[in-house]
């Protein structure tokens, strides 16, 4: 095994005059199956193509894109493992100081909107050479979409980038067919019948049979109700059984999304996972400090794809789909056994998971032939009676992994759906999880405690979490284990008022939880929650939703989740006053915060000093964030 060439010298050493494909990525080159670029490049290599990797090229000049010369078939472009704007900016739009997908965690090695920038550099260097885009950034931006950083609706990234074809979702099937047809002389711009792809065509061209139309780019840019309806239609057509082609007009062209690609079978998923990856970053990065993103996944196992949880704020369903596909035990055992021959392996498998760790089968029997339901979720607000809850196969897999010579411990660190676990009366899985697979803490994701907010999130109500907490504590006590359940929580999600944030603070106090880090809702492309953030409308119900968009209000909601910190007292008091919960300011056991001098002065009797207008002013109920000075007008 060896890394694919990332320099002209490495390509020449292989005896190649030119590459068939040059794969351009916004990440450093890490040859590991947790990284999308590694999967696609190794897949193409296994099919006989010569593939060079252009990782994090300079973006101020087209010089780097000519590093390998003109590829024989074309360029493949990805922004990297995550959206380049998410890689660069926090939820508060502040520039990040670190990039875990770059050598030495160094920020700034990829451009904003990397896919678009790379495509334009390629066009500048090579004119009309074929370009196919894919990866998460392209996949989630395939339709006209609200862009949080521009605070405006942008067109499909296919139109913006000037590429010939877009692959959405997990791209193995699509890439295999595209490469074969390109090798046969067909340009990708002419490929209009491949599932899991998007293309652009003139308005006069025929459209796919049974295609459905959503509102045009111009219309969704101008009217928020229209945007919300288009969002729902797009989300409803992402099932590989029932999904239809979706058409969206962009100026004088149609954007056409073909139906989703078929999921990989177990045999295909095994084959992809067992391609000859180096499972590490390229040695060129060693002197720069390596690539930090490898640390958590180097000795982890991914056993499934897809997620039928389908939370509204999560992009997994829009990218991987809701249908569960899994790898075989034999394949996973072979991968784990190979760990034991790695000199860096200390005997600990860090995780056995995927989008959701404890999903080993589709949620119900009908999905293979009828697809997943369009109008309801499997687990929220309550679990569908048709959902099959069975951890038998996962328990057996974990037992087999524990038995491998050289493996000391197998951890399951995250991605467990506790609501799914609560559908099974048998305690075997949770008991073995507690006994063997948790290192001190188990992290799960209730996200909030307010029923209204959880409904907008597409999550089960908090009583399910509290029932799981009691069950977890009972089993820990029985097993003699001192373990802790750590909840992931989110502030400022659409639907969350200041009173909801106070309710969440009281939930933390009740359960003696003090989170050191707080996650603010991040409006990323391709999710129903981002649609709510932009439009103030729930696309599933078309009902209005309160949206906390004012930066200061979001700060107050976030601060309430750390109400106990002395430095937060002034903000917590202000939040409680705004919420009409001054009963929680005081010295009693049920209070969240003690009054400070400013608060006491503001509450003096008339004639002894007036109230502080900052504390008594009522917020505008529909207040939205002020327009950003850096917003780009389209």
What positions do the PLM features span?
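Terminal amphipathic helices with adjacent charged low-complexity linkers/tails
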Residues: 60, 189-239, 252, 261-264, ...
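Glycine-rich beta-alpha loop elements in corrinoid/cobalamin-binding modules
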Residues: 10, 36, 55-250, 257
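N-terminal pre-triad scaffold of radical SAM enzymes
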Residues: 24-29, 288-315, 340, 348
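Flexible glycine/acidic-rich beta-alpha junction loops that bind and position SAM and/or redox cofactors
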Residues: 83-92, 140-142, 172-177, 201-206, ...
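Conserved, mostly hydrophobic/aromatic
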Residues: 164, 272, 307, 311, ...
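Conserved SAM/AdoMet-binding glycine-rich loop
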Residues: 23, 58-59, 337-486, 490-494
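N-terminal [4Fe-4S]-dependent radical SAM core
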Residues: 1-18, 28, 225-300
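Acidic, low-complexity intrinsically disordered tails
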Residues: 376, 595-634
């Amino acid at each position: 095994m060896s890394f694919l060439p990332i320099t002209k010298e490495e390509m020449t050493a292989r005896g190649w005059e030119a590459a068939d494909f040059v794969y351009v990525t916004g990440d450093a080159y890490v040859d590991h199956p947790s990284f999308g670029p590694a999967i696609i490049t190794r897949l193409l290599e296994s099919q006989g193509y010569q593939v060079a990797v252009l990782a994090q090229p300079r973006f101020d000049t087209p010089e780097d894109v000519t590093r390998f010369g003109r590829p024989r078939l074309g360029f493949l472009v990805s922004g990297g493992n995550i959206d380049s704007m998410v890689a660069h900016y926090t939820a508060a739009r502040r520039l990040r100081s670190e990039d875990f997908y770059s050598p030495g965690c160094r920020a700034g090695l990829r451009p904003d909107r990397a896919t678009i920038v790379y495509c334009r550099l390629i066009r500048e260097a090579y004119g009309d050479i074929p370009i196919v885009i894919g990866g998460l950034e392209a996949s989630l931006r395939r339709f006209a979409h609200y862009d949080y950083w521009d605070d405006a609706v942008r067109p499909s990234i296919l139109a913006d980038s000037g590429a010939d074809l877009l692959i959405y979702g997990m791209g193995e099937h699509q890439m295999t067919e595209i490469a074969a047809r390109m090798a046969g002389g067909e340009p990708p711009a002419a490929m209009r019948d491949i599932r899991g792809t998007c293309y652009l065509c003139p308005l006069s061209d025929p459209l796919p049979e049974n295609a459905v139309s959503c509102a045009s780019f111009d219309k969704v840019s101008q009217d928020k109700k229209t945007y919300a309806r288009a969002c729902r239609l797009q989300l409803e057509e992402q099932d590989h059984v029932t999904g239809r082609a979706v058409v969206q007009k962009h100026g004088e062209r149609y954007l056409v999304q073909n139906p989703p690609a078929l999921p990989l079978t177990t045999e295909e998923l095994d084959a992809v996972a067992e391609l000859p990856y180096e499972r590490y970053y390229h040695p060129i990065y060693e002197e720069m400090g390596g690539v930090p993103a490898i640390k958590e996944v180097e000795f982890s196992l991914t056993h499934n794809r897809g997620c039928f949880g389908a939370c509204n704020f999560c992009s997994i369903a829009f990218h991987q789909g809701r249908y569960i596909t899994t790898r075989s035990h034999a394949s996973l055992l072979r991968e784990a056994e190979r760990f034991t021959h790695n000199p860096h392996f200390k005997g600990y498998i860090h995780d056995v998971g995927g989008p959701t760790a404890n999903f080993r089968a589709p949620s119900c029997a009908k999905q293979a032939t009828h697809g997943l339901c369009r109008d309801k979720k499997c687990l929220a607000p309550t679990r569908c009676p048709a959902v099959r809850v069975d951890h038998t196969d996962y328990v057996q897999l974990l037992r087999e992994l524990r038995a491998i010579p050289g493996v000391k411990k197998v951890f399951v660190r995250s991605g467990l759906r506790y609501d799914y676990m609560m559908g099974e009366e048998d305690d075997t899985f949770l008991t073995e999880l507690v006994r063997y697979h948790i290192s001190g803490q188990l992290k799960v994701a209730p996200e909030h405690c307010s029923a209204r907010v959880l409904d907008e999130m597409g999550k089960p109500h908090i009583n399910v979490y509290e029932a799981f907490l009691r069950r977890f504590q009972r089993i820990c006590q029985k097993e003699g284990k001192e373990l802790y359940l750590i909840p992931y929580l989110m502030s400022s999600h659409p639907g969350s008022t200041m009173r909801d944030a106070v309710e969440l603070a009281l939930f933390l106090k009740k359960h003696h939880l003090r989170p050191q880090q707080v996650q603010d809702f991040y409006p990323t492309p391709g999710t129903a929650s981002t649609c709510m953030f932009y439009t103030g409308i729930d696309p599933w119900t078309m009902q209005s939703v309160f949206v906390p968009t004012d930066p200061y209000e979001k700060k107050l909601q976030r601060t309430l989740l750390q109400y106990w910190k002395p430095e937060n007292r002034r903000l917590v008091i202000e939040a409680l006053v705004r919420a009409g919960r001054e009963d929680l300011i005081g010295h009693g056991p049920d209070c969240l915060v003690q009054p400070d001098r400013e608060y006491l002065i503001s509450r003096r009797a008339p004639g002894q000093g007036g109230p502080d207008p900052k504390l008594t002013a009522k917020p505008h109920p529909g207040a939205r964030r002020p327009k950003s000075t850096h917003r780009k007008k389209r």
